[in-house]
């Protein structure tokens, strides 16, 4: 299950890369449940030797996400990613909620976590999240189960790194492992290059100046302008496992009806 990479912009000069995995087995099981057939057969073929029928239930089919699928996925979970970075990784929530979860255990996000993120605030009722549960996998690793149009498992590989990231976003003074964040990996968006046409230098020998009166065709090169804007790449902090993808709605063009005379 090779991942595909998508990036989500979480600040003016910062992008969060997401490694997106497709859980093929889970998607096939979900399709069987939605079709109301527990033993749904995908392919049937007769066997010529004894006229029996071969049924294949799990063919070796590659399931992948298109660029439009990844864009729709990132657009849907962007608000929840910002909620994870800015609120869930706060020191108060880590110490009072996340650290209380034992390794291998889960808790309801909507009941036990979301109300504490905005406790005492006037906008707590206006905040919506589609994260259903939080499971602690290791000391700093957590799994968030997300279900809306997409059904996902969002893996936080290190809540400690996200807490440091939140500190940088809030106060612009973050260091990672003793190095400045500006020394970390960056994403190159574009750069600016300008080339001016150059006139070749001609050497005159033995008084042949009259032979050089003919016009010289200059190799004029176009001026190409680019803009360079450095963006900080945060590395592999969050992984997304796709469990269910919404159906693609095909746009069908309606046939033109004949105009009434």
Curated annotation (Swiss-Prot):
UniProt keywords, alphabetically: DNA damage, DNA repair, Nucleus
Record field: transmembrane: none
UniProt GO molecular function: 3'-flap-structured DNA binding; 5'-flap-structured DNA binding; bubble DNA binding; Y-form DNA binding
Listed GO biological process terms: double-strand break repair via single-strand annealing, removal of nonhomologous ends
GO cellular component: endonuclease complex; nucleus
Subcellular location: Nucleus
Chief location: nucleus
Domain of life of the organism encoding this protein: Eukaryota
InterPro entries: Saw1
Effect of inactivating the gene: Accumulates recombination intermediates blocked at the RAD1/RAD10-dependent 3' flap cleavage step. Abolishes association of RAD1 at single-strand annealing (SSA) intermediates. Insensitive to MMS, HU, or phleomycin treatment. Doesn't sensitize cells to UV lesions. Substantially increases the rDNA recombination rate.
Role description: Catalyzes 3'-non-homologous tail removal of RAD1/RAD10-dependent single-strand annealing recombination intermediates. Plays a key role in targeting RAD1/RAD10 complex to 3'-flap cleavage substrate in recombination. Also contributes to the integrity of ribosomal DNA arrays.
Misc remark: Present with 1170 molecules/cell in log phase SD medium.
Subunit structure: Interacts with MSH2, MSH3, RAD1, RAD10, RAD51 and RAD52.
Name of the protein in its database record: Single-strand annealing weakened protein 1
Protein species of origin: Saccharomyces cerevisiae (strain ATCC 204508 / S288c)
Biological classification of the source: Eukaryota, Fungi, Dikarya, Ascomycota, Saccharomycotina
